[in-house]
Curated annotation (Swiss-Prot):
Its cofactor is Mn(2+). GO terms for biological process: D-arabinose catabolic process; L-fucose catabolic process. The keyword Metal-binding applies. The gene is fucI. This is L-fucose isomerase. The active site is at 341 (proton acceptor), 365 (proton acceptor).
Length: 595
């Protein structure tokens, strides 16, 4: 039975017997029940199951009650606690001091009882002890009999819960490297300490020859293979063959060992085998392959591909694209953050984005900044709308989740990206129809294969994400909220064909105005690597909250100050230079799972 990470709800009160405690019991419990209902009705785990909370059986008026509740929570995979109170309580006697939980307190903003006073006292206690805790306090005074949760409080509770559940879902899971370093890309040279210390994850290594072994020995479900291949033939239409008419060098011609008309058969096997490597598949045990049936306990992974694989075998573009999509030949299903070129840091960027949204992460090269002047010079036309200040060309070398087509529709008929459990058959078919599969350019991919080719055809709010590693500092996070752009078709065609017309394209315009985001050029210039991952929605504030839980400082973002939500201890390092305070507190606290 699957054990989900949960949030413990702790109602705390003034413990004085003889009228005080008795007058607070009902209100405190109502607050706790309301918080539990809000979280469980709003948030979902990556598999679509509603998030679960555990409500304490009693209110907490002192250390005796706190100890009983701690015992109740033991063994239930409580990753975080939310303490709620309408009144003064006894500071350190009622606080959650478990070193293994992420903490928040919601203090009721009312006049009859000083919930805000306890909140401040508890935050002072946490700061003295060097324990980060999130402070939740409503903007407006409420009446004592008002049992609603104000909107601003709801937003903070949900941001805290989203981040905490993301932390819990990563803990103990694996990132599976299939292959090793790709083309000298530093992000594909995995840093095991980063995964262990900051994410609580294991790192698994699987040589790419394992795929060939399983193909040769037929270590895969033959029924699943037939289903996948038939689905591909029915739904994955082929696009252009960029190799037609070329006089290719002999070294290219003799490098392709899988005949072109057998590419899809090889690719279908590759896709199901890589999925089996990451996850459990009991069908393999039925076939006698019990060790392989157990999988690698994965939550994310990546495939090296270039060049030791792609120089002679069909590339991994289909596998990479379909793993990260919200569907495959079995219909809608949970996405997997799966990185091209095994860029582990972009794989983590994908993972953070998809855990916060439950939507497909789109892997891209942060390829080119196109200024309005350059576009006018090259195309004779001007950029307009969201694109008017210039655009960044997000384009991957053949593999991006098909949700990036923006062909799915919301209830009002608008193009969007969805969680897998909201994807309809019409949505799936629309994404497939908006994608064609172009034969790989043999000059770059001698072994052939097919690239997912589409363009994002909707103006959607998105957030571009990148985790970087800096020697002496450690991991850092970059965030750019903005919009995908629909540009003039003539402009698109000219710009797209200057790069590679067989690859998936998204035109991105970041929101400008914040420091580091003075111009679109500045964003491109500040970006820390050649790759980025974007997800649907403006989730920069949630990413900042999650990063603070993991103790990863944010070096670039365009989230307005009023949306930033970090533990109260961060304000202890200053309220003017927030970036400096972020670095200082993350350094002081150290990684979440520091040894």
């Amino acid at each position: 039975m699957k054990t989900y990470p949960k949030i413990g709800i702790r109602p705390t009160i003034d413990g004085r017997q003889g009228g005080v405690r008795e007058s607070l019991e009902e209100k405190a419990m109502k607050m706790a029940q309301a918080a539990k209902k809000l979280i469980e009705n709003s948030l979902y785990y990556a598999d679509g199951t509603p998030v679960q909370c555990v409500l304490a059986s009693r209110t907490i008026g002192g250390s005796g009650d706190a100890g009983i509740v701690q015992q109740e929570f033991t063994g239930k995979n409580i990753v975080a606690t939310l303490s709620v109170t309408p009144s003064w309580c006894y500071g350190t006697e009622t606080m959650d001091l478990d070193p293994n939980t992420i903490k928040a307190i919601w203090g009721f903003n009312g006049t009859e009882r000083p919930g805000a006073v306890y909140l401040a006292a508890a935050m002072s206690g946490y700061a003295q002890k060097g324990i980060p805790a999130f402070k939740i306090y409503g903007h407006d005074v409420q009446e004592l009999d008002d049992d609603t949760i104000p909107v601003d409080v709801q937003e903070k509770i949900l941001s805290f819960a989203r981040g905490a559940i993301a932390v819990g879902q990563m803990k103990g899971k694996s990132y599976v490297n299939i292959g090793a370093s790709s083309m000298g890309i530093a992000g594909s040279q995995v840093d095991i300490s980063f995964f262990e210390d900051y994410l609580g994850m294991l790192v698994e290594f699987v040589d790419m020859t394992e795929i060939l072994r399983r193909i040769h020995l037929e270590i895969f479900d033959p029924i699943e293979y037939d289903k996948a291949l038939n689905w591909i033939k029915e739904n994955c239409r082929e696009g252009i063959d960029i190799n037609e008419g070329k006089d290719l060098p002999d070294i290219v011609k003799k490098s392709k060992v899988i005949p072109a008309d057998k590419d899809w058969e090889f690719i279908a096997k590759q896709a199901i085998i890589i999925r089996d490597i990451l996850y459990r598949n009991e069908k393999l045990g039925d076939l006698g392959w019990e060790e392989e049936a157990r999988g690698r306990n994965a939550i994310a992974g990546g495939f090296q591909g270039q060049r030791q694989w792609t120089d002679w075998l069909p590339n991994g573009d289909f596998t990479e694209a379909i793993m990260a999509s919200t569907f495959d030949w079995n219909g809608p299903r949970q996405v997997t953050a799966f990185a091209t070129e095994n860029d582990t840091l972009n794989g983590v960027s994908m993972l953070l984005g998809t855990l916060l949204t439950n939507k497909a992460p789109i892997f891209s090269d942060v390829r080119t900044y196109w200024s309005p002047e350059s576009v006018k010079r090259v195309t004779g036309k001007e950029l307009t709308g969201k694109a008017k200040n210039g655009i960044i060309h997000l384009i991957n070398s053949g593999a991006s989740a098909l949700d990036g087509t923006a062909a799915a529709k919301d209830k009002d008929g608008n193009k969007t990206m969805k969680e897998f459990w909201n994807m309809t058959n019409e949505d799936v078919q629309s994404c497939l129809k908006a994608t064609d599969w172009c034969r790989a350019n043999y000059e770059y991919f001698r072994g052939g294969g097919f690239s997912s080719h589409f363009k994002t055809e909707a103006e959607l709010p998105v957030t571009l994400i990148r985790v970087n590693l800096i020697k002496g500092i450690g991991p850092t996070l970059q965030i750019a909220e903005g919009y995908t752009c629909v540009i003039d078709e003539d402009i698109h065609q000219i710009l797209d064909e200057r790069t590679d017309k067989t690859w998936p394209t998204t035109w991105f315009a970041p929101n400008l105005g914040e420091c580091g985001f003075e111009t679109v050029y500045d964003v491109m210039n500040h970006w820390g690597a050649n790759h980025g991952a974007f997800v649907h929605g403006h989730i920069g504030s949630d990413l900042i909250t999650l990063a603070s839980m993991l103790r990863i400082p944010v070096t670039l973002h365009n989230v307005p100050r009023e949306r930033i939500f970090r533990p109260n201890i961060f304000e202890g390092a200053g309220t003017k230079a927030l970036e400096t305070a972020d670095f200082e507190i993350c350094r002081l606290l150290g990684p979440l799972y520091k040894k």
